[in-house]
Amino acid sequence: MSELTIDPATTALVLIDLQRGITAGQTVPNAAPDVIARAARLAAACRRRGMLVVLVRVDPGADGALFPRPQADQPRPPLTVTPEWTELVPELDRQRDDVVVTKHQPNAFYATDLEVHLGRRGIRTILLGGISTNVGVEATARAAHERGFEQVFIPDVMAAREVDLHEHSVRRIFPTLGRVRPLDVVLTALA
C-alpha cells in the first residue's frame, strides 16, 4: 500500500446519498449512523484544509418514477418517497461553500453538473464515500474513472444493504479504479 498524500487544492470530497431516505434503512458492515458520523468528521477535516466538499443526493421522483425499471430477474422493490426522503442528513453540517448535487440515477455524473463543479475548480482527485457502496458509490466511481479522476475510496465511510455486495466493491472493483484507504489514513494525510 503506497503512502497517501492529498493536495487540498486539487482534491474534493464527494459523499454519496447520505440522506434521510437512504440512511434510515439497515446497512452493513457499517451501520448508517456510524457512516454518517465518520463522513461528518471527514467533511470537517476537508473543510479545515479549504477543500471542496460535494454532497450528492438522489431524487428518484414520486414513488421512484425517475429510476430505471427494466425487466429484471431481481427487480427493485417499490419505493415510497416522502418529502423528507431526499433531505441530506443534518449531521453533515452543510456549509455555504459546499456543493450539493441532485441526481436521479445511481451515477452522480449522469445528467448533473458534478463534472462542471470539479473541472472548474481544477479537481483531479476525489475522496469517495457514501451509501450504498455497490450502487451509488460504485456507479459514481466507475464514471469518475472513465473521466480520468484519481480516486481514494474510504470503506469505513461506506455501507450497503448486504455485506457481500459491499465487500465485492471494496475488494474487487475499487482497487482497479483507485486506492482504498481507511479513514484514519485519510485523516492523517489531511492533518
Predicted regions located by residue number:
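A short glycine-rich beta-strand->turn/loop micro-motif centered on a GG-aromatic cluster
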Residues: 127-130, 150-163
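Glycine-centered short loops/turns at secondary-structure junctions
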Residues: 48-51, 122, 148
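Internal catalytic-core helix/loop-beta-alpha segment
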Residues: 82-85, 89-130
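Active-site acidic carboxylates
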Residues: 1-95, 99, 190-191
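A charged, well-structured terminal subsegment
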Residues: 177-191
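Active-site-proximal loop->helix
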Residues: 162-175
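Short Gly/Thr/Asp-enriched flexible loops that form oxyanion-binding sites at enzyme active sites
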Residues: 137-147
